[in-house]
Structures are given as structure tokens and as C-alpha cells.
């Protein structure tokens, strides 16, 4: 049985919407000469994502419904990009690119299945400077895992020795060299405590979510600080969050480094899925100074994904952020969007409304550490995005 929402089955309405979108796109000045074709059947990839009961048959509004991530890197040095998929249930999967758009499952040989825990996402990074990508995997209260790559696509679990075995409600793993010592450090984003201590699962274990999980940001006791780990060399890391002043309590799913003020030191923009984003300025690799509202007076409320790139080709890095809360005032998609765009949020939930942008935000770098929010002028809004 396939259920198609009436508004999506209305071909006349879809044609009108398509015409409007093409008209808008023609004015954007952005053009391309490529197209995408679904090649999944030919690829040989049979991976299927499985989610815990709280996000499936026993669905409740909890952060489990945010799903999982993936990471891409050339794990065996053959010049082709391989793909690592993360699943909440049943284990993760590493698919080796054999060329010609074909892949083979090498999870067992690589030793990276992690079938005993609820996965969230993963990041590849050459943390020991040996020329091959190592792997860090985040989980929900089963302990994060760090693997060292032997250069041939075989991985060794070095979590305990590395100091990166954080156990909590982790999400994004952002590797960057914050102190410019030539070694990649790690900023680990933690969402906040959204699960109880009750364990459930049929053939697997997970922690049941709070019934009021999405009100967790109103309860200080559920905050979970994100962590900054300094790379000491030889894949050994030390938590320097307190030492550097980077003690962020946002309900964060991701973050991104950016040299926002042009001083040569990577600063950090931290997303908050249940509040306003935060910005920390790097003070010479020794400390981070919170300058969120001075540099970004208004940010998205409910940010889910971030990319730093040069939007307008002026040589300066800009910031594109997708937000799960739309600012659209007219119906543009499924009925849920119309309901969502007319929601009224209590002051208690949204905090300082004057500092909030409802919908995606694009910060154009004006130089000199100044940014201007231009999402409306470049048509950057879309229907309920969850990642970027």
C-alpha cells in the first residue's frame, strides 16, 4: 500500500508549483550543466537503515527520529572514495568502491560493524598524519568509538588508549587543527540528555526517550556539554574544554570551523537545534571567547546542518545553515509545512525571539569579521531541511 498525500497527487498543483520554482531559479544567476541519475540498483549497495522502536513502531517525539549519518573517504588508498553508513540498529556498514560505480561490502573484513550499539554518525580524519583516514563513530549512550586505519582499509579499535571514548548523547565529530600544531583536534557535539535510564529493545538494546524529550532544553539538568579534545600525537587526545573556555551547552548536532575574523586562527560556529547558535572566537589557539551575539546578532532557531563555503565567489568564506523551522508564510508543500509556518511558540520555548531567525540562514562574509544575513534575498528557504 502506498499512501500519497492528496496535495502531492494533485498534478495541476504540482505543475503550478514547478513553474513557480523554475521562474524563481531563472532569476538566481546560478546555472549548471549536470544532472543526477539514481544508480543505486547498479551500485550493488544493499544497505538499509534501521531505527530503534522509539523512532519507528513505538514512535514518539524524540531525537532518535533525527536518523543517522554517513562518511566518505578512500579507506584503502586505491584512489576511489568508499562509503561508511551508520545505523541505529543492526550495525554499520563499510562499502568499498571497486570502480565503475560498483561497491562491495567489506564491513566484516574492516572490523567496523559496531552491531552492539545505537549509532548516530561518523567522521573520517587522518589524526596520526600517516596518510590514511582514521574513523570516529558517535553513538547514543553506548560509548563513542575511535578506529585507527592500517592503510589497507582494516581498522583497529583504539578507543581506550586514545581518550575519545565519551559516553553520552553524541552527534557530530568535527576535526580541525584549532592550535595549528599540525595535528587534527576533535570538537564533539552533544545533543543533551533525551533518554531515560530504562532499557528496551527486541534483539538489541537502547535507552527509552523521555516523553518530553523536545522540552529538554528547558531543563538545565538535561544539558550535556560538548567537548574539545586536543591531539597530543600518536592518536592520543586530551579533553581541553575547560582549559580553553569552550564549554558549550547547546543541544548541538553539528558545528563547523571558520576563520571568521581573518586572523588565521580557526574559530568555531556551533549549531543549536533547540535554541540560538553560538560562535566562539579562537584566541591564538589557547582559548575560545564566546562572541555569539556581537558577530551574529540573530541566528536560526533549530539549526540542523551547516556548510562553510564561498557563496558569492568574492574570496571570503560564507556560512549556509539549514533550519528545521520554516519562515514561509504561504503554503508551499505538504500540509505539515503550512501548519508549521503558522505555529506560535511560547516565549519560554523560544527564548529571546529577537535573536531568532525562523528558517534557513545565510551569512555573507563582509570582511573584517562582519557578516550579513541574506537568506531571503537569495531564495535560500526550503521545506523542513534536516541536514546539509
PLM segments and residue spans:
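Acidic, glycine/proline-rich Ca2+-coordinating loop motifs
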Residues: 1-388
Amino acid at each position: 500500500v502506498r499512501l500519497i498525500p492528496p496535495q502531492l497527487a494533485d498534478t495541476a498543483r504540482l505543475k503550478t508549483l514547478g513553474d513557480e520554482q523554475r521562474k524563481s531559479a531563472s532569476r538566481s544567476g546560478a546555472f549548471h550543466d549536470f544532472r543526477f541519475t539514481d544508480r543505486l540498483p547498479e551500485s550493488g549497495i544493499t544497505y538499509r537503515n534501521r531505527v530503534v522502536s522509539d523512532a519507528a513502531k513505538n514512535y514518539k517525539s524524540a531525537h532518535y527520529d533525527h536518523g543517522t549519518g554517513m562518511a566518505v573517504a578512500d579507506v584503502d588508498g586505491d584512489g576511489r572514495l568508499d562509503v561508511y553508513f551508520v545505523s541505529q540498529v543492526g550495525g554499520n556498514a563499510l562499502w568499498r568502491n571497486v570502480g565503475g560505480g560498483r561497491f562491495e561490502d567489506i564491513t566484516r573484513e574492516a572490523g567496523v560493524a559496531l552491531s552492539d550499539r545505537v549509532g548516530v554518525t561518523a567522521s573520517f580524519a587522518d589524526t596520526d598524519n600517516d596518510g590514511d583516514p582514521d574513523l570516529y563513530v558517535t553513538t547514543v549512550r553506548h560509548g563513542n568509538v575511535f578506529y585507527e586505519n592500517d592503510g589497507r582499509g582494516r581498522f583497529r579499535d583504539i578507543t581506550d588508549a586514545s581518550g575519545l571514548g565519551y559516553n553520552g548523547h553524541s552527534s557530530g565529530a568535527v576535526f580541525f587543527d584549532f592550535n595549528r600544531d599540525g595535528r587534527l583536534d576533535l570538537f564533539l557535539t552533544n545533543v543533551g540528555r533525551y533518554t531515560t535510564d530504562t532499557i528496551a529493545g527486541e534483539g538489541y538494546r537502547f535507552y527509552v526517550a523521555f516523553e518530553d524529550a523536545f522540552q529538554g532544553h528547558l531543563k538545565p539538568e538535561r544539558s550535556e556539554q560538548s567537548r574539545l579534545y586536543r591531539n597530543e600525537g600518536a592518536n592520543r587526545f586530551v579533553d581541553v574544554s575547560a582549559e580553553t573556555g569552550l564549554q558549550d551547552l547547546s543541544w548541538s548536532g553539528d558545528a563547523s570551523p571558520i576563520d571568521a575574523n581573518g586572523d588565521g586562527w580557526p574559530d568555531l560556529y556551533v549549531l543549536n537545534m533547540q535554541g540560538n547558535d553560538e560562535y566562539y572566537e579562537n584566541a591564538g589557539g589557547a582559548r575560545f571567547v564566546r562572541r555569539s551575539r556581537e558577530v551574529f546578532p540573530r541566528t536560526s532557531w533549530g539549526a540542523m546542518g551547516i556548510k562553510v563555503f564561498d557563496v558569492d565567489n568574492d574570496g571570503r568564506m560564507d556560512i549556509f545553515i539549514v533550519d528545521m523551522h520554516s519562515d514561509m508564510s504561504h503554503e508551499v508543500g505538504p500540509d505539515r509545512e503550512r501548519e508549521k509556518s503558522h505555529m506560535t511558540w511560547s516565549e519560554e520555548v523560544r527564548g529571546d525571539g529577537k535573536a531568532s531567525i525562523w528558517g534557513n540562514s545565510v551569512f555573507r562574509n563582509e570582511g573584517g569579521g562582519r557578516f550579513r544575513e541574506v537568506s531571503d534575498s537569495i531564495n535560500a528557504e526550503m521545506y523542513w531541511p534536516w541536514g546539509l
